[in-house]
Amino acid sequence: SDILCLNSFENLFHQNFSSNIAGVVSDHDSMLNYAQKAFNLNSNYYFNSGFLIINLINWEKNNISDKAISLLLNKNNFKYYDQDVLNLLLANKTLLLEKKYNTIYHLADMNTPISNDTIFLHYSGSVKPWQSWGQYHFLTSLWLKYKNNSPWKNVPILQPQTYKQAKFMTRMSYRNKKFIKSIYWYIKYSFWKIKSKLKV
C-alpha cells in the first residue's frame, strides 16, 4: 500500500456528513486547475481519491457506482480515471477534511518533514517506497519499518524494469551523489530506450 496510518483516526467516525456523500481531502492546487480546464469541474477544490470516507447511504441513494462506471465507459478525456470521475460526480457533495487525514507526499520532488499530527501518509506520485529509486528519501525508511513487520517483509524492493524506471533511478542516484550507480543506470536507460524504439 502507498498509505501508512500513523495516528488514530477515531475522530473520523464522529464527523457530521449531513447530506454529503463522502469525506475528502483536497489535492494540490495544480490539480484543481487541471480539472477545471479538462472537464469544467464546478468546485472550489479537487480531492485525492486515495483516501475517502464514504457515507454509504448517500452513496447508494445517488447511485454513484453505476454513474462512475458509465462515465468511464463513455468518456475518454479523464487523465486520472476514477479520481476525475468521482470529483465530477461528487462536486459540492463532499465534506472537506483536514490535510492530516491524507498527507499527500511526492518522493520525487518533496523533501520537507511531515507534521507530527499526520494520520494517513500518502506516498502519491510515480515514485513509491517499494521501488529501488525511491530508497534515498528519508520518508522511505518509515515505510520500510512497517514493511519489515508485515507478512511481506521478505518481498524484495522493486528494481527498474523499463527505460522510464531506469531514468528515474539515474536521476535519483545522481541527486544523492551516487555517481557510479547513476552512470550505470544511465547506460541501462539508454540501451533499453533504444531497444524499445526499435520494436515499434
Spans of features found by a protein language model:
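Short, surface-exposed beta-edge/turn micro-motifs
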Residues: N20, N48-G50, Q83, D117-T118
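A short, conserved beta-to-alpha structural element at the edge of catalytic cores
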Residues: S18-S43, Q135, L139-K145, N149-S150
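GT-A fold catalytic core of metal-dependent nucleotide-sugar glycosyltransferases
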Residues: S1-S30, N44, I53-I54
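A generic structural signal for short, solvent-exposed coil/turn residues
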Residues: Q15-F17, N44-Y46, L89, T112-P113
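Intrinsically disordered, low-complexity boundary segments flanking structured domains
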Residues: L6-H14, A38-L41, D82-V85, I104-N111
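A short secondary-structure junction signal
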Residues: S1, N7-N11, N33-K37, N62-A68, ...
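A glycosyltransferase accessory/donor-loop signature
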Residues: L56-V200
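A recurrent flexible, glycine/aromatic-enriched loop bordering the glycosyltransferase active site
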Residues: N40-F51, F78
